């Protein structure tokens, strides 16, 4: 059996300033990645609404760290079937999935930013991954590169 080169392990603290603006308009603080996925911290300002997007090749799992808000998700191509489009409340301790082909948009309640950590699988490939879609709310933040 051939030996594989091990990937060095890493430790990283959350940066004080964002590294980028996501295509949905959230402030992104990059954390770590491996071949199978990457982790980042996202923050949407209090009272703000993101841009609605879908992803071409990645799936995500989110964990809400702080703040409250709502998320809209719709499985593309299934708009008329019950249960495949919904709006749900978000708060600290909640986790959710964004499967491949899911359109989504979220908003933060007034009073505190909505802050979450997301695992992206496979790692975020870069520009061209996010595709703008029509969502239920009017965005209030500037979008980053798609």
Report each predicted region and the residues it spans.
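A short, N-terminal "cap"/entry segment at the start of jelly-roll beta-barrel domains
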Residues: 1-38, 51-52, 88, 128-146
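Short hydrophobic/aromatic-rich beta-strand segments that constitute the beta-sheet cores
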Residues: 40-41, 51, 71-73, 116, ...
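Conserved short histidine dyad/triad with adjacent acidic residue
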Residues: 40-58
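Short beta-strand His + acidic residue motifs that chelate non-heme Fe in jelly-roll/DSBH
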Residues: 51-53, 71-72, 98, 104-111
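Glycine- and acidic-residue-biased ligand/ion/polar-headgroup-sensing regions
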Residues: 57-70, 74-77
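A short hydrophobic beta-strand segment most commonly corresponding to one strand
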Residues: 61, 111-130
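Short acidic-glycine-tyrosine-enriched beta hairpin
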Residues: 77-100
């Amino acid at each position: 059996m051939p030996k594989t080169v091990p990937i060095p392990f890493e430790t990283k603290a959350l940066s004080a300033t964002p590294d980028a603006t996501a295509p949905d308009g959230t402030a992104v603080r990059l954390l770590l990645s491996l071949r199978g996925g990457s982790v980042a911290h996202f923050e949407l300002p209090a009272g703000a609404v993101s841009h609605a997007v879908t992803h071409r090749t990645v799936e995500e799992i989110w964990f809400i760290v702080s703040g409250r808000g709502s998320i809209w998700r719709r499985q593309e191509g299934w708009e008329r079937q019950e249960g495949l489009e919904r709006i749900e409340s978000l708060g600290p301790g909640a986790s959710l999935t964004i499967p491949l082909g899911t359109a989504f948009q979220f908003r933060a309640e007034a009073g505190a930013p909505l802050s979450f950590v997301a695992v992206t699988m496979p790692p975020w490939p870069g520009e061209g991954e996010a595709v703008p879609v029509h969502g239920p709310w009017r965005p209030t933040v500037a979008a980053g590169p798609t």
